[in-house]
Regions:
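Catalytic machinery of carbohydrate-active enzymes
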Residues: 1-158
């Protein structure tokens, strides 16, 4: 059942960021979501943030206007390196955050459930976010009742 706020927001998004960076399946499952976002917001620019190794797959998904690649392997290599590895990883991620913030997204959907994507959503300071986000202490939060239900099924299915 749609609320008045859902109907009011329909078609108002102009610059959308979709996070689907943790698994190839996230991207493939994002295809119907991308189609729906474009149908409801036909004038919106849709950027997808993906791990560099999955970018070629995204080029074949209709509705994506821009692919922003992040090199997670580089971040992992940095974090496992001695000396300045942590600094290099921080500087790389700081650059990613700064570049994405400069694009002034008005909506973000996090299709991944990883903790670091929730923190990334928090750092981007996008005014309207759905999916996993982080609070001030880095705890993962979900605001959407449907996402809460999905997470409950996934995380408590054993």
């Amino acid at each position: 059942m749609s609320s008045a706020n859902d109907k009011k927001a329909k078609g108002t998004k102009k610059n959308i960021l979709l996070l689907a960076i943790t698994r190839m399946g996230d991207m493939l499952q994002a295809s119907p979501t991308i189609a729906g976002l474009k149908r409801e917001n036909p004038q919106a620019k849709l950027t997808i943030l993906v791990d560099r190794e999955f970018a070629p797959i995204c080029r074949g998904i209709p509705g994506i206007d821009e692919i922003y690649e992040i090199d997670l392997a580089f971040v992992c290599r940095c974090l496992h390196r001695d000396q300045d590895g942590v600094v290099d990883a921080f500087e790389y991620m700081e650059q990613v955050v700064d570049e994405l913030k400069a694009r002034n997204f008005d909506f973000c959907l996090n299709m991944a459930s990883a903790g670091y994507t929730a923190i990334l959503m928090k750092l981007l300071e996008i005014p309207d976010c759905s999916g996993w986000i982080a609070d001030e202490e880095g705890n993962r939060l979900i605001h959407s009742p449907w996402s809460m239900l999905f997470a409950a099924f996934v995380y408590h299915s054993n």
